[in-house]
């Protein structure tokens, strides 16, 4: 999982990326390509 300051650019890298808020943190998740997983921090 990558840790990034800004997730907006990461979200656009694949069409299945989703921006999700969990427990006060923002994540990018992708069910089909797991390598696009990232957390904002």
From Swiss-Prot:
GO terms for biological process: translation. HAMAP family: Ribosomal_bL36 (MF_00251). One of its GO terms (cellular component) is ribonucleoprotein complex. The keyword Metal-binding does not apply. The keyword Cell membrane does not apply. This is Large ribosomal subunit protein bL36. It comes from Methylorubrum extorquens (strain PA1). One of its GO terms (molecular function) is structural constituent of ribosome. It comes from the Bacteria. Coiled coil: none annotated. Keywords: Ribonucleoprotein, Ribosomal protein. NCBIfam families: PRK00831.1, rpmJ_bact. InterPro entries: Ribosomal_bL36, Ribosomal_bL36_sp, Ribosomal_L36_bact. Belongs to the bacterial ribosomal protein bL36 family.
């Amino acid at each position: 999982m990558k840790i990034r300051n800004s997730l907006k650019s990461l979200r656009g890298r694949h069409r299945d990326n989703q921006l999700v808020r969990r427990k006060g943190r923002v994540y990018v998740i992708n069910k089909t390509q797991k390598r696009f997983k990232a957390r904002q921090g």
